[in-house]
UniProtKB/Swiss-Prot annotation:
Positions bearing carbohydrate: N8, N421
Classification via Pfam families: MFS_1 (PF07690)
Biological function: MFS-type transporter; part of the gene cluster that mediates the biosynthesis of the antibiotic 2,4- dihydroxy-3-methyl-6-(2-oxopropyl)benzaldehyde (DHMBA) and its derivatives. Is probably involved in the transport of the metabolites to the environment.
Induction / repression: Deletion of the conserved eukaryotic csnE deneddylase subunit of the COP9 signalosome leading to defect in protein degradation results in the activation of the silenced dba gene cluster. Expression is positively regulated by the dba cluster specific transcription factor dbaA. Expression is also controlled by the transcription factor flbB.
Gene from which this protein is expressed: dbaD
Basic and acidic residues bias (residue ranges): 31-44
Organism this protein belongs to: Emericella nidulans (strain FGSC A4 / ATCC 38163 / CBS 112.46 / NRRL 194 / M139) (Aspergillus nidulans)
Name the UniProt record assigns to this protein: MFS-type transporter dbaD
Length: 444
């Protein structure tokens, strides 16, 4: 048996040592790389995501309900002032301050309401940048200042600037906080909370006409309007004191969502709302003057038709909103549009004070839903919830065109036959509301 040469053993040993050294280096390299692996996984699995998501809305509690009170006061001094314009229309028609046609006078209220919607469209991005307090202060100042200037006005142009533009711009600054703050504090109870806040517009539409009617005799027009300005000042201090922006959007919303124009249900509902507001504002502007001019009632009672209508609308803005949480807003707003159209047409047959009061009560209830439900409808039509602010602003901006046209168009129809074409006015208001209801039923 032959023995292996000793050098073979030395070669094998050297090879084994080389292999062991390579294994050691490989193992050392592997071990050295292991601590880095979790870091690589962490950096790829957890990229920076920006600020943490805000907690869900509390849906109650002292702070949340204080914001409902603040929202109530905002609606009290925005839509509440708009709803009271019918009393100013009746007073201006008397010629005590200036002599102008019904259509010219209605431009004051129409511009005021249009400014509310259009300025609200542009101030949405300011709100998104976190300037809630600035909007509240500027809007409150414009409303109070506008009324103080209105108390000094003697001509149509002065009234148009003070009441139409100044008060309207102030209301527009407050409109976005009206509809944007509460959804950050309520989700499951949003309809109820928003309905309670929106009822402030009805309360304003009751109190402001009564104040003007009761004080204009003993104090005159100037001091009566100043008292309205002081009431606005006191009530607007409440939202300035209690309202805070709970959630600041990560970035300011775009002014226009171009995809909305190809969204057929959204555009159909916007068109329907535009037509509904045309008919509704014809009713709000002229029902008081109708009672005095026919004459169905005396002048004093004619002033109270607007507060009666707005008192009923308080229930129309709360009950349907609360029901919308259960059965959906579209199942309510469509029949309300149809009901308003029928009631406006019923004014063609009204010849007694009792009949006029009944129409005012019923149209106030169903008309209140036409103002309270659209924000919920726009929310329901927006699939991408990050675009809610944009879509609400766009929708109300387009609806503002109907508000702008509604009153003056009705005034032009009325003035066609020496301020007596009431048949044409009520047919115009009734048909536009009926068409709006049918569009919602068919297309949305």
């Amino acid at each position: 048996m032959t023995e292996q040469p000793p050098q073979n053993h030395s070669v094998d040993l050297n090879q084994n040592e080389d292999n062991n050294e390579n294994d050691y280096r490989s193992s050392s390299a592997t071990d050295a790389e292991r601590p880095c692996e979790p870091k690589i996984e962490e950096s790829t699995a957890k990229p920076p995501t920006g600020p943490p998501a805000p907690p869900p809305p509390p849906n109650g509690g002292l702070v949340a309900w204080l914001h409902v009170i603040g929202g109530f006061m905002l609606f009290f001094n925005t839509w509440g002032i708009m709803n009271a314009f019918g009393v100013f229309q009746t007073y201006y028609e008397s010629g005590a301050l200036f002599e102008r046609s019904s259509s010219d006078i209605s431009w004051i209220g129409s511009i005021q309401a249009t400014m509310l919607l259009l300025v609200g469209f542009f101030t949405g991005s300011i709100y998104d940048r976190g300037y809630l307090r600035a909007l509240l202060v500027v809007g409150s100042f414009c409303i109070v200042f506008g009324h103080m200037m209105l108390s000094l006005c003697k001509t149509y142009g002065q009234v148009l600037l003070a009441q139409g533009f100044c008060v309207g711009i102030g209301a527009g600054c407050l409109f976005v906080p009206c509809v944007s703050v509460l959804p950050t504090y309520f989700s499951s109870r949003l309809g109820t909370a928003l309905g309670l806040a929106v009822s402030g517009s009805s309360m304003g539409g009751v109190i402001y006409p009564i104040v003007l009617n009761e004080l204009i005799g003993p104090l005159g027009f100037g001091w009566s309007v100043r008292v309205i300005g002081f009431i606005a000042l006191g009530t607007l201090l409440v939202p300035i004191a209690v309202m805070k922006q709970r959630v600041k959007p990560p970035r300011a919303r775009a002014l226009i969502d171009w995809s909305a124009f190809s969204d057929i249900p959204y555009m159909a509902f916007t068109l329907a709302s535009l037509l509904a507001f045309m008919g509704l504002f014809a009713l709000l502007f002229y029902i008081s003057y109708f009672g005095a001019a026919k004459p169905i009632t005396d002048t004093r009672m004619a002033f109270y038709i607007v507060p009666i209508l707005n008192a009923a609308s308080c229930f129309g803005r709360t009950i349907p909103n609360a029901m919308a949480d259960k059965i959906g807003p579209f199942n309510l707003i469509a029949p309300c549009c149809l009901a308003v159209g029928v009631l406006i047409l019923c004014l063609l047959a009204v010849t007694t004070e009792a009949g006029l009061i009944v129409i005012a009560l019923l149209s106030g209830f169903f008309g209140g839903a036409l103002i309270g439900l659209p924000p919920l409808c726009f929310v329901a039509l927006t699939k991408d919830k990050t675009k809610i602010g944009t879509r609400i602003g766009m929708g109300f901006g387009m609806v503002g065109l109907g508000v702008l046209a509604g009153g003056p168009a009705g005034g032009a129809i009325l003035s066609h036959s020496h301020h007596s074409n009431w048949t044409g006015l009520w047919v115009y208001g009734g048909v536009t509301s009926l068409v709006a209801g049918f569009i919602i039923c068919i297309a949305v």
